[in-house]
């Protein structure tokens, strides 16, 4: 049995979108322990994911906080991960790669950087949908994908029937139209129409 690391920070929507990729990684590593490096808002939520052995907290402090980086890298190295799936694909996680596995290719560190299609720039590649990018990344990394393009986030649900009954909420529907304040292009403009 070996240890596998998945990295996913981001927003709740990012976590939901990555659920299919995480399930595919788990299905392809049935005898391994899967750990996910994520942030405090999603720590407890990700602990409920049946495909994850445990969650490792990344406080995402400044890269200039050398003490924090040293402690995080020391902690990660203790797990002796044989494979890392970087589903965040950010400058921060690329920086982590350069510290943990500086010479690793997709056989050790799976990311956009290590699986980019030949002759394609990252800017052009990033124009594709995130689920298609995950699928490409995992396929190049030897993962058979069945769930990546149809993520199942049902593992995150809670039974709220008692709350609904107590407060007579059966006739209500709650929408949470959250989006990143700096990524306005990702905002879905049809919530008002949906409500009507």
Language-model features, listed with the residues they occupy:
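Catalytic machinery of carbohydrate-active enzymes
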Residues: 1-196
């Amino acid at each position: 049995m070996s240890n596998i690391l998945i990295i996913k920070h981001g927003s709740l929507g990012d976590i939901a979108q990555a659920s299919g990729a995480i399930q595919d990684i788990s299905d392809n590593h049935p005898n391994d322990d899967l750990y996910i490096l994520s942030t405090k808002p999603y720590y407890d939520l990700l602990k409920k994911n049946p495909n994850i052995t445990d969650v490792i907290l990344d406080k995402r402090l400044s890269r200039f906080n050398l003490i924090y980086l040293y402690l995080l890298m020391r902690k990660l190295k203790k797990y002796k991960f044989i494979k890392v799936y970087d589903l965040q694909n950010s400058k921060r996680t690329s920086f982590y790669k350069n510290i943990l596995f500086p010479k690793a290719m997709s056989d050790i560190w799976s990311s956009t950087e290590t699986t980019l299609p030949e002759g394609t720039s990252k800017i052009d590649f990033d124009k594709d949908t995130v689920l298609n990018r995950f699928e490409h990344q995992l396929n190049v990394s030897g993962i058979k994908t069945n769930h990546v393009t149809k993520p199942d986030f049902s593992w995150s649900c809670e039974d709220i029937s008692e709350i609904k009954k107590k407060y007579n909420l059966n006739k209500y529907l709650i929408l949470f139209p959250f989006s990143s304040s700096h990524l306005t292009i990702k905002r879905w403009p049809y919530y008002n129409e949906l409500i009507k």
